[in-house]
Design a protein with these regions (language model features):
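Peripheral, non-AAA+ core regions of ATP-driven protein-machinery
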Residues: 1-55, 63, 170, 309-310, ...
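Terminal amphipathic helices with adjacent charged low-complexity linkers/tails
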Residues: 3-4, 67, 71, 187
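Proline-centered turn/helix-capping motifs that create local helix->coil transitions or kinks
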Residues: 6-18, 80-81, 93-99, 193-196, ...
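Switch/coupling sub-region of P-loop NTPases
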Residues: 30-43, 52-54, 89-155, 160, ...
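Walker A/P-loop
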Residues: 57-99, 164
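Conserved inter-motif catalytic segment of the P-loop NTP-binding fold
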Residues: 83-117, 124-128, 232, 272-281, ...
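Basic, amphipathic alpha-helical bundle interface domains used for macromolecular binding and assembly
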Residues: 129, 151-349
Length: 349
């Protein structure tokens, strides 16, 4: 106010702020080239990025799950102006935008601690409702490390936003709906001690303990995660080889090509990527060869898949075909998509 008074009196002129020019910012410090080995996991993350699919990584401590997850934004398409406006509104309500950053210029990457409350995850609070981690991840990535360590009620708050792309926070004073279309990336150990299936045989957990640990993630929640990928320990031979791995830039080029295919396919439908495909669009948008159809039919019966799991496999297969530049989903595309449902397979053991 004092500055305004001096300006009106002519004692001190307020200089205009330079206009904000929107451009995307991409941190250069995190690159997939830094990660030795784990080619199968990188492939799964590339598929997830290409179709905006949710992914769960399962592996022992030190296998690189967190390292890989933190590099996922480096292969995602640039944030568009429209997406930035949507996400910036959420951050503005949360009071997380500063004077020198009136808009987000990079995709959000949120990684809440496993002690976060249901309110912290979904939003709410006393008085004015505030967006939670779910909405702060809109148009970006929500990374949940050590997934079974999160409280069950916190994990379950994700179920509806994963389906609807929005979350409604209801309080006595009223309700508020925030957007929440994000990529969910989860990481977990295979058991409580972390070493089930490890070549060293270090696991000390009983079969019942392992089952109880995995039951912390409900079946309906697992159904909503498109890809389940095992992350093995990296052997010494790969660690000592300091030859740079494939860069994020190269992977991002393939992701962008696949996203461009999806953009043209879904133009005017309100759908932007394969993960958002609606049930009524599946038949026309996911044509299968006869061999692929028979494979999917056999997998449905053999794995005891739910209808939701079947649809998610089909969406992942659609993305794999897009990465290959092919219109029809082949047997190879379907087989690769099926192998990313490892927890469905293990449920039969």
């Amino acid at each position: 106010m004092a500055q305004l008074t001096r300006h009106l009196e002519g004692a001190e002129l307020i200089q205009p702020e330079p206009p904000f020019q929107f451009h995307t910012v991409r941190p250069d410090s995190l690159d997939f080239a830094d990660v030795m080995g784990q080619e199968s996991v990188k492939r799964a993350l590339e598929i997830a990025a290409a179709g905006s699919h949710h992914i769960l990584m399962i592996g022992p401590p030190g296998s690189g799950k967190s390292m890989l997850a933190k590099r996922l934004p480096s292969i995602l398409p640039d944030l568009t102006l429209e997406e930035s406006l949507e996400s910036s509104k959420v951050y503005s309500v949360a009071g997380l935008l500063g004077r020198h950053q009136p808009m987000l210029q990079a995709r959000p990457f949120r990684s809440p601690h496993h002690t976060v409350s249901a309110v912290g995850m979904a939003g709410g609070g006393a008085g004015r409702t505030r967006p939670g981690e779910i909405s702060l991840s809109h148009n970006g990535v929500l990374f949940l490390d050590e997934l079974p360590e999160f409280r069950r009620d916190v994990i379950e708050t994700l179920r509806q936003p994963l389906e609807d792309g929005q979350v409604t926070v209801s309080r006595i004073s009223g309700s508020c709906t925030y957007p929440s279309r994000f990529m969910l990336v989860c990481a977990m150990n295979p058991c409580r001690c972390g070493y089930f299936g490890h070549p060293s045989g270090r696991c000390t957990c009983s079969e019942q303990s392992i089952r109880n640990y995995r039951k912390k993630i409900s079946g309906p929640m697992l159904d909503r995660i498109d890809l389940h990928i095992n992350v093995p320990s990296v052997p010494y031979e790969q660690l000592k080889d300091r030859k740079p791995a494939e860069s994020s830039e190269r992977i991002r080029e393939r992701v962008n090509r696949a996203r461009d295919i999806q953009k043209r396919r879904y133009a005017g439908t309100g759908v932007y990527c394969n993960a958002q495909l609606l049930p009524g669009m599946m038949r026309d948008c996911c044509p299968l060869t006869e061999e692929a159809r028979l494979l999917m039919e056999g997998a449905f019966d053999r794995l005891g898949l739910s209808a939701r799991s079947y649809d998610r496999i089909l969406k992942v297969a659609r993305t794999i075909a897009d990465l290959a530049g092919e219109e029809q989903i082949s047997e190879l595309h379907a087989a690769e998509a099926i192998q990313y449902r490892s927890l469905d397979r293990e449920a039969l053991l």
